[in-house]
A protein has these predicted regions:
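Residues that flank catalytic or metal-binding motifs in active/ligand-binding sites
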Residues: 3, 30, 117-118
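Short, well-formed alpha-helical segments that are part of the catalytic scaffolds
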Residues: 15-29
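N-proximal low-complexity "stem/linker" segments adjacent to membrane-targeting elements
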Residues: 1-18
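Active-site-proximal specificity loops/subdomain of glycosyltransferases
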Residues: 42-80
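Short, polar loop motifs at secondary-structure junctions
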Residues: 37-43, 94-99
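GT-A fold catalytic core of metal-dependent nucleotide-sugar glycosyltransferases
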Residues: 70-124
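Short, hydrophobic beta-strand segments that form beta-sheet elements in well-ordered domains
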Residues: 31-39, 88-90
Length: 124
């Protein structure tokens, strides 16, 4: 039985890019249940990635995306998803080179050599 915390992300669009496919698959290979919440029908998710409708977390307002950006909406989605599911948020371009620690409640990705935190990987 897999005891690792699940990881999850959001995709707004119909097709994943090759890099996103590789990165999502890396989490599957590391042993994490990997969920991709989608605003559109996506048919090229890697094997092992569970595709679910983004509406399970929140409705995706296309007018808001058009007026701001998908990134803006993704920021709101990420924290709602963490609150509702307890999964670790991963950006679709975050590669997993080792499983996330099972005994850590808080997980944050680092950015660059300075060690600054970013919101591309977040577990709360």
């Amino acid at each position: 039985m897999n005891t690792r915390r699940p990881v999850a992300s959001l995709w707004i669009g119909e097709k994943l890019h090759y890099l996103n496919q590789l990165c999502l698959k890396s989490h599957v290979v590391a042993g994490h249940k990997t969920i991709l919440y989608c605003a559109d029908k996506v048919d090229n998710a890697p094997e092992g990635v569970e595709v679910r409708p983004a509406s399970e977390i929140m409705e995706i307002d296309r007018e808001l995306v058009a007026a701001t950006s998908a990134s803006f909406l993704s920021n709101v989605f990420r924290y709602k998803m963490i609150q509702k599911t307890g999964a670790i948020w991963i950006d679709c371009d975050a590669f997993c080179h080792q499983p996330f620690p099972e005994d850590q409640e808080y997980i944050f990705g680092r950015h660059g050599m300075s060690g600054a935190l970013n919101c591309g990987v977040v577990g709360l």
